[in-house]
Amino acid sequence: ILDAPLLTVHTLSGPFRVEGAQPGDLLIVDILDVGPIPQEDSGPLAGQGWGYTGIFSRNNGGGFLTEQFPDAYKAIWDFAGQTATSRHVPGVSFTGIIHPGLMGTAPSAGLLATWNNREGALIATDPDRVPPLALPPEAEHAILGGVPRDQWARVGSEAARTAPPRENGGNQDIKNFTKGSRVFYPVFVDGANLSMGDLHFSQGDGEITFCGAIEMGGFIDLRVDLIKGGMETYGVSENAIFMPGNVEPNYSHWLAFSGTSVTLDGEQKYLDSHLSYQRACLHAIDYLTKFGYSPEQAYLLLGSAPIEGRLSGVVDIPNSCSTVYLPTEIFDFDVRPSASGPFQIDPGMGAPSAANK
Protein backbone atom coordinates (compact mmCIF):
# COMPACT_ATOMS: atom_id res chain seq x y z
CA ILE A 1 0.00 0.00 0.00
CA LEU A 2 2.83 2.41 0.86
CA ASP A 3 4.43 2.03 -2.59
CA ALA A 4 1.31 1.19 -4.59
CA PRO A 5 2.06 1.98 -8.27
CA LEU A 6 -0.66 4.56 -8.81
CA LEU A 7 0.51 5.21 -12.38
CA THR A 8 -0.71 1.76 -13.40
CA VAL A 9 -3.91 1.28 -11.37
CA HIS A 10 -7.34 1.16 -12.98
CA THR A 11 -6.41 -1.04 -15.91
CA LEU A 12 -9.84 -1.25 -17.52
CA SER A 13 -11.72 -3.84 -19.54
CA GLY A 14 -12.57 -2.38 -22.93
CA PRO A 15 -13.21 -0.24 -24.78
CA PHE A 16 -16.17 -2.12 -26.24
CA ARG A 17 -17.68 -0.69 -29.40
CA VAL A 18 -21.49 -0.67 -29.45
CA GLU A 19 -22.89 -1.09 -32.94
CA GLY A 20 -25.06 1.83 -34.01
CA ALA A 21 -24.03 4.17 -31.17
CA GLN A 22 -23.50 7.77 -32.31
CA PRO A 23 -22.74 11.07 -30.58
CA GLY A 24 -25.92 12.39 -28.97
CA ASP A 25 -27.32 8.97 -28.13
CA LEU A 26 -27.80 7.59 -24.64
CA LEU A 27 -26.13 4.23 -24.05
CA ILE A 28 -28.23 2.01 -21.77
CA VAL A 29 -26.08 -0.32 -19.65
CA ASP A 30 -27.80 -2.98 -17.54
CA ILE A 31 -25.68 -4.60 -14.83
CA LEU A 32 -27.01 -8.16 -15.04
CA ASP A 33 -24.54 -9.62 -12.56
CA VAL A 34 -21.31 -8.67 -10.78
CA GLY A 35 -19.25 -10.55 -8.23
CA PRO A 36 -15.86 -11.80 -7.04
CA ILE A 37 -13.91 -14.42 -8.96
CA PRO A 38 -16.48 -17.25 -9.21
CA GLN A 39 -15.93 -20.60 -7.49
CA GLU A 40 -12.75 -19.39 -5.80
CA ASP A 41 -12.80 -19.58 -2.01
CA SER A 42 -9.09 -18.92 -1.58
CA GLY A 43 -6.08 -17.94 -3.62
CA PRO A 44 -3.36 -15.33 -4.03
CA LEU A 45 -5.47 -12.79 -5.94
CA ALA A 46 -7.91 -10.28 -4.47
CA GLY A 47 -11.35 -11.64 -5.26
CA GLN A 48 -10.38 -15.25 -4.50
CA GLY A 49 -12.27 -15.31 -1.22
CA TRP A 50 -10.82 -12.04 0.04
CA GLY A 51 -10.32 -8.35 -0.71
CA TYR A 52 -8.54 -5.40 0.82
CA THR A 53 -9.01 -1.80 1.90
CA GLY A 54 -6.07 0.60 1.92
CA ILE A 55 -5.20 4.01 3.28
CA PHE A 56 -2.70 5.56 0.87
CA SER A 57 0.13 7.57 2.39
CA ARG A 58 0.08 11.33 1.95
CA ASN A 59 3.07 11.17 -0.43
CA ASN A 60 1.47 8.51 -2.61
CA GLY A 61 -2.09 9.55 -3.32
CA GLY A 62 -3.30 10.42 0.16
CA GLY A 63 -6.95 10.17 1.10
CA PHE A 64 -9.92 12.17 2.33
CA LEU A 65 -8.38 12.53 5.81
CA THR A 66 -4.72 12.49 4.78
CA GLU A 67 -3.74 15.31 7.16
CA GLN A 68 -4.91 13.21 10.10
CA PHE A 69 -3.75 9.89 8.60
CA PRO A 70 -0.52 10.51 6.64
CA ASP A 71 0.76 6.92 6.78
CA ALA A 72 -0.23 3.78 4.86
CA TYR A 73 -2.56 1.16 6.38
CA LYS A 74 -4.57 -1.80 5.15
CA ALA A 75 -7.23 -4.27 6.18
CA ILE A 76 -7.82 -7.68 4.62
CA TRP A 77 -11.46 -8.77 4.40
CA ASP A 78 -12.58 -12.39 4.09
CA PHE A 79 -15.68 -13.22 2.05
CA ALA A 80 -18.28 -15.80 3.09
CA GLY A 81 -21.10 -15.60 0.57
CA GLN A 82 -22.26 -11.98 0.72
CA THR A 83 -20.63 -11.27 4.10
CA ALA A 84 -17.28 -9.61 4.82
CA THR A 85 -15.23 -9.89 8.04
CA SER A 86 -11.68 -8.85 8.87
CA ARG A 87 -9.03 -9.97 11.33
CA HIS A 88 -7.73 -6.39 11.16
CA VAL A 89 -11.07 -4.80 12.16
CA PRO A 90 -12.66 -7.26 14.61
CA GLY A 91 -16.19 -7.18 15.91
CA VAL A 92 -17.93 -6.34 12.64
CA SER A 93 -19.51 -8.27 9.79
CA PHE A 94 -21.59 -6.80 7.00
CA THR A 95 -23.31 -7.65 3.77
CA GLY A 96 -21.37 -6.54 0.72
CA ILE A 97 -22.79 -4.18 -1.87
CA ILE A 98 -20.85 -5.40 -4.92
CA HIS A 99 -20.40 -2.87 -7.72
CA PRO A 100 -17.97 -1.53 -10.34
CA GLY A 101 -16.25 1.62 -9.14
CA LEU A 102 -15.54 2.74 -12.70
CA MET A 103 -17.54 2.61 -15.92
CA GLY A 104 -18.06 5.05 -18.76
CA THR A 105 -17.95 5.96 -22.42
CA ALA A 106 -15.06 7.52 -24.33
CA PRO A 107 -14.76 11.31 -24.67
CA SER A 108 -14.65 13.10 -28.00
CA ALA A 109 -11.35 14.72 -28.96
CA GLY A 110 -12.78 18.09 -27.96
CA LEU A 111 -13.98 16.85 -24.58
CA LEU A 112 -10.62 15.19 -23.91
CA ALA A 113 -8.86 18.48 -24.66
CA THR A 114 -11.23 20.26 -22.29
CA TRP A 115 -10.33 17.82 -19.49
CA ASN A 116 -6.61 18.24 -20.02
CA ASN A 117 -6.82 22.03 -20.24
CA ARG A 118 -8.91 22.56 -17.13
CA GLU A 119 -7.07 19.97 -15.01
CA GLY A 120 -3.72 21.31 -16.18
CA ALA A 121 -4.77 24.82 -15.19
CA LEU A 122 -5.72 23.55 -11.74
CA ILE A 123 -2.37 21.79 -11.30
CA ALA A 124 -0.57 25.00 -12.31
CA THR A 125 -2.05 26.85 -9.34
CA ASP A 126 0.01 24.68 -6.95
CA PRO A 127 2.25 22.34 -8.98
CA ASP A 128 4.23 21.04 -6.00
CA ARG A 129 1.25 20.18 -3.80
CA VAL A 130 1.30 16.82 -2.01
CA PRO A 131 -1.02 15.07 -2.77
CA PRO A 132 -1.35 16.73 -6.20
CA LEU A 133 -4.43 18.70 -7.21
CA ALA A 134 -5.01 16.51 -10.28
CA LEU A 135 -3.23 13.86 -12.35
CA PRO A 136 -1.96 14.86 -15.81
CA PRO A 137 -1.49 12.42 -18.71
CA GLU A 138 1.47 10.08 -18.21
CA ALA A 139 2.65 8.87 -21.62
CA GLU A 140 5.11 6.29 -20.29
CA HIS A 141 2.41 4.33 -18.46
CA ALA A 142 -0.54 4.80 -20.83
CA ILE A 143 -2.11 1.55 -22.06
CA LEU A 144 -2.62 2.24 -25.75
CA GLY A 145 -3.59 -1.16 -27.14
CA GLY A 146 -3.62 -1.19 -30.93
CA VAL A 147 -2.61 2.43 -31.45
CA PRO A 148 0.18 2.52 -34.09
CA ARG A 149 3.56 2.74 -32.40
CA ASP A 150 4.51 5.95 -34.18
CA GLN A 151 1.52 7.67 -32.51
CA TRP A 152 2.18 6.50 -28.95
CA ALA A 153 3.98 9.66 -27.86
CA ARG A 154 1.21 11.96 -29.08
CA VAL A 155 -1.67 9.84 -27.84
CA GLY A 156 0.04 9.11 -24.52
CA SER A 157 0.57 12.80 -23.89
CA GLU A 158 -3.20 13.37 -24.24
CA ALA A 159 -4.63 10.18 -22.72
CA ALA A 160 -6.76 10.94 -19.66
CA ARG A 161 -5.94 9.33 -16.34
CA THR A 162 -8.77 7.21 -15.00
CA ALA A 163 -8.70 8.39 -11.36
CA PRO A 164 -11.52 10.99 -11.40
CA PRO A 165 -15.16 10.94 -12.45
CA ARG A 166 -15.91 13.14 -15.44
CA GLU A 167 -18.72 13.95 -17.90
CA ASN A 168 -18.46 10.45 -19.42
CA GLY A 169 -18.99 8.66 -16.11
CA GLY A 170 -15.57 7.36 -15.13
CA ASN A 171 -14.42 6.63 -11.60
CA GLN A 172 -17.59 7.68 -9.83
CA ASP A 173 -17.31 5.08 -7.05
CA ILE A 174 -21.07 4.99 -6.55
CA LYS A 175 -21.75 2.06 -4.25
CA ASN A 176 -25.32 1.74 -5.56
CA PHE A 177 -24.17 0.57 -9.04
CA THR A 178 -25.20 -2.93 -8.02
CA LYS A 179 -26.61 -5.93 -9.83
CA GLY A 180 -29.90 -4.84 -11.38
CA SER A 181 -28.84 -1.24 -11.98
CA ARG A 182 -29.57 0.48 -15.28
CA VAL A 183 -27.24 3.32 -16.30
CA PHE A 184 -27.75 5.85 -19.10
CA TYR A 185 -24.42 7.15 -20.43
CA PRO A 186 -24.01 10.05 -22.87
CA VAL A 187 -22.32 9.01 -26.12
CA PHE A 188 -19.57 11.29 -27.45
CA VAL A 189 -17.98 9.13 -30.20
CA ASP A 190 -19.15 6.61 -32.78
CA GLY A 191 -19.45 3.23 -31.06
CA ALA A 192 -19.58 4.80 -27.58
CA ASN A 193 -16.45 2.83 -26.56
CA LEU A 194 -17.60 1.55 -23.16
CA SER A 195 -14.98 0.62 -20.56
CA MET A 196 -15.23 -0.58 -16.97
CA GLY A 197 -13.24 -1.92 -14.02
CA ASP A 198 -12.31 -1.32 -10.36
CA LEU A 199 -14.68 -3.87 -8.81
CA HIS A 200 -15.60 -3.48 -5.13
CA PHE A 201 -17.11 -6.02 -2.71
CA SER A 202 -18.37 -3.20 -0.51
CA GLN A 203 -17.86 0.53 0.05
CA GLY A 204 -19.02 3.39 2.22
CA ASP A 205 -20.28 6.58 0.60
CA GLY A 206 -17.32 8.71 -0.40
CA GLU A 207 -14.75 5.86 -0.50
CA ILE A 208 -12.98 8.08 1.99
CA THR A 209 -9.61 6.32 2.31
CA PHE A 210 -9.11 6.62 -1.52
CA CYS A 211 -8.38 2.88 -1.69
CA GLY A 212 -11.39 2.85 0.55
CA ALA A 213 -13.69 0.20 -0.81
CA ILE A 214 -13.02 -3.52 -0.46
CA GLU A 215 -11.01 -3.93 -3.65
CA MET A 216 -11.24 -7.22 -5.52
CA GLY A 217 -10.93 -8.98 -8.83
CA GLY A 218 -14.08 -10.44 -10.29
CA PHE A 219 -16.54 -10.50 -13.17
CA ILE A 220 -19.30 -8.30 -14.52
CA ASP A 221 -22.09 -9.25 -16.93
CA LEU A 222 -23.65 -6.39 -18.90
CA ARG A 223 -26.35 -5.80 -21.51
CA VAL A 224 -26.44 -2.68 -23.66
CA ASP A 225 -29.03 -0.83 -25.72
CA LEU A 226 -29.45 2.66 -27.18
CA ILE A 227 -31.84 5.59 -27.01
CA LYS A 228 -31.19 7.36 -30.29
CA GLY A 229 -30.83 11.10 -29.77
CA GLY A 230 -31.41 10.56 -26.06
CA MET A 231 -28.98 13.22 -24.85
CA GLU A 232 -31.15 15.98 -26.33
CA THR A 233 -34.47 14.24 -25.66
CA TYR A 234 -33.78 13.86 -21.93
CA GLY A 235 -31.44 16.79 -21.35
CA VAL A 236 -28.50 14.55 -20.46
CA SER A 237 -25.71 16.55 -22.07
CA GLU A 238 -23.12 15.28 -19.60
CA ASN A 239 -22.81 12.83 -16.69
CA ALA A 240 -24.76 9.60 -16.48
CA ILE A 241 -28.12 9.08 -14.83
CA PHE A 242 -29.01 5.72 -13.35
CA MET A 243 -31.63 3.54 -11.70
CA PRO A 244 -30.14 1.60 -8.74
CA GLY A 245 -30.60 -2.13 -8.45
CA ASN A 246 -32.63 -3.71 -5.66
CA VAL A 247 -29.98 -5.85 -3.93
CA GLU A 248 -28.64 -3.48 -1.27
CA PRO A 249 -28.25 -4.62 2.37
CA ASN A 250 -31.43 -4.08 4.33
CA TYR A 251 -30.11 -2.32 7.42
CA SER A 252 -32.78 -0.50 9.41
CA HIS A 253 -30.98 0.89 12.48
CA TRP A 254 -28.41 3.66 12.18
CA LEU A 255 -26.24 5.94 14.31
CA ALA A 256 -25.63 9.26 12.54
CA PHE A 257 -22.78 11.75 12.98
CA SER A 258 -22.84 15.32 11.70
CA GLY A 259 -20.20 17.88 10.78
CA THR A 260 -20.11 21.54 9.78
CA SER A 261 -17.84 23.87 7.81
CA VAL A 262 -15.44 24.62 10.67
CA THR A 263 -11.82 23.44 10.63
CA LEU A 264 -10.23 21.47 13.45
CA ASP A 265 -8.51 24.63 14.69
CA GLY A 266 -11.78 26.57 14.72
CA GLU A 267 -11.61 28.54 11.46
CA GLN A 268 -14.99 29.25 9.89
CA LYS A 269 -15.41 28.34 6.20
CA TYR A 270 -18.31 29.26 3.93
CA LEU A 271 -20.70 26.41 3.07
CA ASP A 272 -17.78 23.99 2.61
CA SER A 273 -19.48 20.62 2.22
CA HIS A 274 -16.18 18.82 1.67
CA LEU A 275 -15.00 20.05 5.07
CA SER A 276 -18.30 19.29 6.78
CA TYR A 277 -18.19 15.69 5.51
CA GLN A 278 -14.62 15.38 6.79
CA ARG A 279 -15.74 16.60 10.21
CA ALA A 280 -18.65 14.14 10.28
CA CYS A 281 -16.26 11.28 9.48
CA LEU A 282 -13.81 12.43 12.16
CA HIS A 283 -16.62 12.56 14.71
CA ALA A 284 -17.55 8.97 13.82
CA ILE A 285 -13.91 7.91 14.18
CA ASP A 286 -13.59 9.62 17.57
CA TYR A 287 -16.73 7.82 18.72
CA LEU A 288 -15.57 4.36 17.60
CA THR A 289 -12.21 4.73 19.37
CA LYS A 290 -14.11 4.87 22.68
CA PHE A 291 -15.02 1.21 22.09
CA GLY A 292 -11.38 0.17 21.70
CA TYR A 293 -10.76 0.58 17.98
CA SER A 294 -7.68 2.45 16.84
CA PRO A 295 -8.37 5.56 14.74
CA GLU A 296 -7.00 3.71 11.72
CA GLN A 297 -9.32 0.74 12.23
CA ALA A 298 -12.29 3.10 12.47
CA TYR A 299 -11.19 4.97 9.32
CA LEU A 300 -10.83 1.71 7.37
CA LEU A 301 -14.27 0.62 8.54
CA LEU A 302 -15.93 3.84 7.35
CA GLY A 303 -14.36 3.38 3.92
CA SER A 304 -15.44 -0.22 3.47
CA ALA A 305 -18.74 -0.75 5.31
CA PRO A 306 -22.01 0.37 3.63
CA ILE A 307 -22.28 3.69 5.47
CA GLU A 308 -24.60 6.38 4.11
CA GLY A 309 -23.25 9.89 3.53
CA ARG A 310 -25.59 12.84 3.02
CA LEU A 311 -25.49 16.56 2.37
CA SER A 312 -28.09 17.43 4.97
CA GLY A 313 -27.94 21.21 4.65
CA VAL A 314 -26.25 23.41 2.03
CA VAL A 315 -28.02 26.80 2.37
CA ASP A 316 -27.76 27.92 6.01
CA ILE A 317 -24.81 30.31 5.90
CA PRO A 318 -22.05 30.03 6.89
CA ASN A 319 -22.22 26.29 7.61
CA SER A 320 -23.11 23.35 5.46
CA CYS A 321 -24.11 20.22 7.37
CA SER A 322 -23.02 16.75 6.29
CA THR A 323 -24.02 13.52 7.98
CA VAL A 324 -22.59 10.01 8.13
CA TYR A 325 -25.00 7.17 8.92
CA LEU A 326 -23.39 4.07 10.45
CA PRO A 327 -25.48 0.86 10.41
CA THR A 328 -25.47 -0.38 14.00
CA GLU A 329 -26.37 -3.94 13.00
CA ILE A 330 -22.92 -4.59 11.51
CA PHE A 331 -21.36 -4.71 14.99
CA ASP A 332 -21.17 -7.81 17.19
CA PHE A 333 -21.91 -5.60 20.21
CA ASP A 334 -24.21 -2.70 21.06
CA VAL A 335 -22.56 0.41 19.62
CA ARG A 336 -25.30 2.80 20.73
CA PRO A 337 -24.71 5.31 23.56
CA SER A 338 -26.01 4.16 26.94
CA ALA A 339 -25.64 4.93 30.64
CA SER A 340 -23.43 1.86 31.07
CA GLY A 341 -20.72 3.29 28.83
CA PRO A 342 -19.06 1.89 25.71
CA PHE A 343 -18.40 -1.83 25.45
CA GLN A 344 -14.66 -2.50 25.20
CA ILE A 345 -13.59 -4.73 22.34
CA ASP A 346 -10.30 -6.51 21.86
CA PRO A 347 -8.80 -4.60 18.89
CA GLY A 348 -6.78 -7.67 17.95
CA MET A 349 -3.71 -7.36 15.78
CA GLY A 350 -4.77 -3.96 14.46
CA ALA A 351 -4.28 -2.60 10.96
CA PRO A 352 -0.87 -3.27 9.36
CA SER A 353 0.93 0.01 8.65
CA ALA A 354 3.95 1.58 6.98
CA ALA A 355 5.22 5.07 7.80
CA ASN A 356 4.88 7.86 5.23
CA LYS A 357 8.15 8.47 3.38
Regions found by a protein language model. Give the residues of each.
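TerminUS-proximal long segments
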Residues: I285-K357
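Short alpha-helix capping/helix-loop boundary micro-motifs
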Residues: H10-F16, E167-Q172, I285-Y287
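Extended, compositionally biased non-globular segments
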Residues: N246-G303, I307-R310
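Intrinsically disordered, low-complexity linker/loop segments enriched in Gly/Pro
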Residues: D33-T178, F184
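Short, well-ordered loop/turn sites that connect or cap secondary structure elements
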Residues: V18-A21, F177
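Short, Lys/Arg- and Gly-enriched loop/turn segments at beta-strand edges
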Residues: V34-G49, G191-F201, L311-V314
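A generic structural signal for residues embedded in beta-strands
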Residues: L26-V29, Y185
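Conserved mixed alpha/beta catalytic, RNA-binding, or beta-rich assembly cores of soluble enzyme
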Residues: I123-T125, R129-L271
